[in-house]
Swiss-Prot record:
The keyword Repressor applies. Keywords: Nodulation, Plasmid, Repressor, Transcription, Transcription regulation. It holds the Pfam family HTH_Tnp_1. GO terms for biological process: DNA transposition. Residues 1-58 are annotated as: Disordered. Residues 24-34 have a biased composition (Basic residues). This is Probable transcriptional regulator SyrB. Belongs to the SyrB family.
Length: 148
């Protein structure tokens, strides 16, 4: 019986160990609960992106181009009013099929080729005229300075 009443430092150490052990368990379990709650909240906030068909994309691109061409709004405002992001607009515009785009006229065609040839001839004539004029001017300046 004397041993039971003399618990002193051993009993105190056991009591401290018991109080620390449950506290450690509580902290780790609360951490698990917090991360579990965080994962649930994160999974609820992610939305599935909307996919547009090719015709919807073309319609939105045409709508944006029309608004900008009319001068009603800037490109950025037109993109926002269409309900898409700027990045999406540029990706769609880049990936648009060449058939969807307006056919551009070729720069050099029939009559344009003849005009280009005529302009080249005129350009050559003007270059020669300028070089002759500069040679004459240089010769006159040399005479005035007495370099010849």
């Amino acid at each position: 019986m004397a041993d039971e009443s003399n618990t002193g430092p051993v009993a105190a150490a056991e009591a401290v160990a018991e109080t620390q052990a449950p506290a450690g368990k509580r902290k780790s379990s609360s951490r698990r609960q917090r991360t579990a709650a965080g994962q649930v909240a994160e999974s609820k906030t992610t939305a599935k992106p909307k996919r547009y068909s090719e015709t919807e994309r073309a319609d939105k691109l045409n709508l944006i181009e029309a608004e900008v061409a009319q001068g009603n709004s800037t490109l950025k405002d037109a993109i926002k009013s269409a309900g898409i992001s700027e990045q999406t607009y540029y990706v769609w515009k880049k990936s648009a099929k060449p058939a969807d785009r307006k056919p551009e006229e070729s720069v050099v065609a029939g009559d344009d080729l003849a005009d280009l040839i005529q302009l080249d001839k005129e350009n050559l004539r003007l270059r020669n005229l300028l070089s002759d004029k500069l040679r004459a001017e240089n010769a006159e300046l040399r005479k005035r300075l007495g370099l010849d």
